[in-house]
Regions:
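Surface-exposed edge beta-strand/loop patches
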Residues: 119-149
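Bacterial N-terminal signal peptides that target proteins for export
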Residues: 1-13
């Protein structure tokens, strides 16, 4: 089959893929190629105090991660660090979106003004050495508190 025939075949298939992904909203939320998108999707108050954070991890890096730990600084409405949290989000499979829930104790969701990604002490692709993840991170938040680097 020649290049022209392949192009004629590929164009309708590409159009169908766009139509299918667009129909379900997947194309708009896909992580940029080569990136690991970390999104705070929502906060939810915990009965008895505290805030539950829903994190989405979209792994478009081409690698699965067997180790991924974050150190987060939680700022209150006064701009003061309320607490530091260490979060283990592994495993993060390649080409998947993973939901992880983490509890932030003793602070209401409404009192969280910012979440700072302070450090990523563990970023270990499967069967590889620990690496610097910062260049591949894409941080987002759908909450009133931005996720910053």
């Amino acid at each position: 089959m020649g290049n022209a025939a392949l192009r004629r075949l590929a164009m309708p298939l590409a159009g169908m893929a766009v139509a299918l992904f667009g129909q379900h909203g997947l194309a708009q939320t896909a992580a940029p190629a080569g990136k690991l998108t970390i999104e705070i999707n929502k906060f939810e108050e915990i009965d008895g105090g505290g805030c539950r954070a829903f994190f989405l991890f979209q792994n478009a890096t081409g690698k699965s991660f067997e180790g991924f730990e974050m150190s987060l600084a939680i700022f209150n409405k006064d701009g003061v660090i309320d607490r530091l949290l260490s979060i283990d989000a592994a495993p993060l499979p390649v080409a998947r979106t993973t939901l992880k829930l983490f509890e932030i104790p003793q602070i209401t969701c409404a009192n969280i003004s910012e979440v700072l990604l302070h450090d990523v002490p563990v970023c270990k692709p499967q069967n590889e050495a620990n690496t610097d993840c910062y260049p591949m991170l894409d941080l987002k938040s759908r909450t009133s508190a931005p996720l910053e680097e």
